[in-house]
Amino acid sequence: MNLLKRATFIFSEQPLSLAIVIERSFSLGSSGMDNVIPLVRNTIPPLTSKKHKGQDGRIGIIGGCQEYTGAPFFAAISALKVGADLSHVFCTKDAAPVIKSYSPELIVHPVLDSPNAVEEIEKWLPRLHSVVVGPGLGREDMLLKNAKEIIERSKLRGIPVIIDADGLWLVAKEPSVIQGYQRGILTPNFMEFTRLYEAMHHEPLDSSDHKRSAQQLSIALGHLTLVLKGEEDIITDGKNILTCSQEGSGRRCGGQGDLLSGSLGAFAHWAFSSPSDATKGMNPSLVAAFGATSLTRQCNRQAFHKHGRSTTTSDMIQEINSAFKKLFES
């Protein structure tokens, strides 16, 4: 409670495992935002010449197939632009040359559809600080099966796992793959959220109260951290709810969710590797997710200011440096 100047108590009328939820609503310039942004800043590693390459983050992106090559690129390059040192993309063979052509800064592994894909990727897990599963993954059974096994093996190593896009399709089909993993973060849009909710609760979603529905889904998934993207981003671990209503724009270009998931890969590594007092007792997943959602919205706002309705995710990625400075270094 001492983290925030204002808190609203929500009393649950339904038999949830938590009867009282503290809702923390943040928007740029509000006292709430002013209180949580320092927690994000506390987790950001300082730039110093004493470090070696890789210490500030080695992020793995699991995704990229023949149809979808842009999404894994956006996620991987966003992680780098936020401040991770290395980004690996584990994709299918036919996607690899395309993704490599987008940027020489990415390390691209054409193994996701190989017969020994899981073993090939597992070799790299000891070197990775977080894994982002889903951007450009597609829904082929073999790719989903490989992604599932990679999630399982990442969990065994305690690696933060961010799941987005078709990775969420996998979770809706097999929730146990991530259920209860306290270093897992899901980033659904409303359609993906609805699919997850109905898969877990076996009843239609009541869309009249997104916060309560998000809390219920998080609890059903073992207090997994969720980021429900929308007009305001709702972040919850089933115990606490944060809403990021920072100004963005009306432009919703494809790919900005990949910017969010990739940057979240970096923020999650920083949050979980920070001293326990850095987040003042708040769940590191919540702090990381708030940092990533705030950054994505600020990038959208700045890009829209320059490009208007022509704004694309590439324009947003170009804003990461200045948006990061504005939010976390000013």
Curated annotation (Swiss-Prot):
List the catalytic activities from the record.
(6S)-NADHX + ATP = ADP + phosphate + NADH + H(+); (6S)-NADPHX + ATP = ADP + phosphate + NADPH + H(+)
InterPro entries named among the record's database cross-references: Carbohydrate_kinase_pred_CS, CARKD, Ribokinase-like
What keywords sit in the KW lines? Answer: ATP-binding, Lyase, NAD, NADP, Nucleotide-binding, Phosphoprotein
CDD domains recorded for this chain? Answer: YXKO-related
A Pfam family the protein falls into: Carb_kinase
What cofactor is needed?
Mg(2+)
Binding residues for (6S)-NADPHX, per the UniProt record? Answer: G136, N189, F190, M191, E192, F193, T194, R195, D258
Q: Where is the YjeF C-terminal domain?
A: 36-327
Q: Which GO terms describe its molecular function?
A: ATP binding; ATP-dependent NAD(P)H-hydrate dehydratase activity
EC numbers, comma separated: 4.2.1.93
Instruction: Please provide the Gene Ontology terms (biological process) for this protein.
Output: metabolite repair; nicotinamide nucleotide metabolic process
Query: Which positions in this protein are listed as binding ATP?
Result: 229-233, 248-257
The record's function comment reads: Catalyzes the dehydration of the S-form of NAD(P)HX at the expense of ATP, which is converted to ADP. Together with NAD(P)HX epimerase, which catalyzes the epimerization of the S- and R-forms, the enzyme allows the repair of both epimers of NAD(P)HX, a damaged form of NAD(P)H that is a result of enzymatic or heat-dependent hydration.
Recorded hits in NCBIfam families, A to Z, give: yjeF_cterm
Q: Which family does it belong to?
A: Belongs to the NnrD/CARKD family.
Q: What is this protein called?
A: ATP-dependent (S)-NAD(P)H-hydrate dehydratase
Q: Tell me which species this is from.
A: Danio rerio
- What taxonomic lineage is listed for the species of origin? Eukaryota, Metazoa, Chordata, Craniata, Vertebrata
Q: Which gene encodes it?
A: naxd
